[in-house]
From Swiss-Prot:
Protein name: Suppressor of hydroxyurea sensitivity protein 2
Subcellular location: Nucleus
Keywords for this protein: DNA damage, DNA recombination, DNA repair, Nucleus
Gene: SHU2
Function per UniProt: Plays a role in a RAD51/RAD54-dependent homologous recombination repair (HRR) pathway to repair MMS-induced lesions during S-phase. Required for error-free repair of spontaneous and induced DNA lesions to protect the genome from mutation.
GO term, biological process aspect, one: maintenance of rDNA
Keyword Oxidoreductase among record annotations: no
Chief site of localization: nucleus
């Protein structure tokens, strides 16, 4: 990553994207020129598409409700079917139900509290070039995405026999140079070393879209999930359904 990129706090800029009355057009325009333009437009469009899902599992609540029927939230999603891993159900149907708004807001706050008992998975409903629906799995903590664009970047690097760490990762071991930026940061819990992915080389619309809402501020996340819902938050309190979700993601990717 070059020196100019190293002094930019992307997550701080993301956190200013939403004002009290909605998206700040000036900040959006600024971000438009900070990233490849088509990539940024696609990332921002995803946030309004109702194709992005955040599946949240609260381990503590899962234990307490293990023998109970979950009546807090009607997820309207059959996780036992691979076709419904990323359902086309609109965000309003799930996020804005009278009996689930408070529950959703509670989980949104927890997503920013670094709660070890709270786990979440990021999945995007997507169709491949042959028309087959294949869910895209995104992992911000390890900067991974199962989409074709991300896979192609990695494939080209491997074919060129390049070292992936040297090509994509910057290591910072000088404490005085540590950053507050969380965009592209991996293994963030280390106290002696910071690792950042070179997002100029390794970035796709899915990673960018989830970074905007999960590596910025609760206000931005709330805007895109509750106020102008385009991202669907689905709480899961059954460990069985949580495991089914993972099994179906793996099964779909193998297909």
């Amino acid at each position: 990553m070059n020196e100019d990129a190293s002094v930019i706090n992307y997550s701080e800029i993301f956190s200013t994207l939403v004002k009290d009355d909605g998206v700040d057009d000036m900040v959006a325009s600024f971000l438009y020129y900070m990233f490849p333009r088509e990539l940024f437009i696609r990332g921002l469009s995803l946030l309004e598409s109702s194709d992005m899902f955040i599946y949240v599992f609260d381990a503590m609540k899962g234990e307490s409700s293990e023998s109970e029927v979950n009546t807090d939230v009607d997820t309207s999603v059959n996780l036992s079917s691979k076709e419904n891993i990323a359902t086309s159900t609109t965000a309003t149907q799930i996020n804005a139900k009278d009996n689930s708004v408070d529950v959703t807001k509670n989980y949104l706050n927890k997503l920013y509290e670094d709660d070890d008992l709270l786990q979440y998975r990021l999945i995007v409903k997507s169709s491949s070039s042959d028309g087959i629906e294949t869910p895209v799995y995104v992992d911000l903590h390890n900067w991974l995405c199962s989409c074709e664009e991300y896979t192609e970047i990695m494939r080209e690097c491997l074919l060129a026999d390049k070292d992936l760490v040297q090509e994509f990762v910057q290591l910072i071991d000088d404490f005085s140079c540590f950053r507050d930026d969380t965009f592209g940061q991996i293994e963030a819990h280390s106290l002696s070393l910071q690792k950042y992915v070179n997002t100029k080389k390794l970035l796709c619309p899915h990673l960018l879209a989830y970074s905007i809402i999960l590596l910025s501020s609760p206000k931005v996340l709330r805007h895109y999930t509750v106020e102008k819902p385009g991202v669907i938050v689905i709480p899961i309190t059954s460990i069985d359904e949580w495991l089914k979700l993972h099994i179906n993601v793996l099964y779909s990717e193998k297909k």
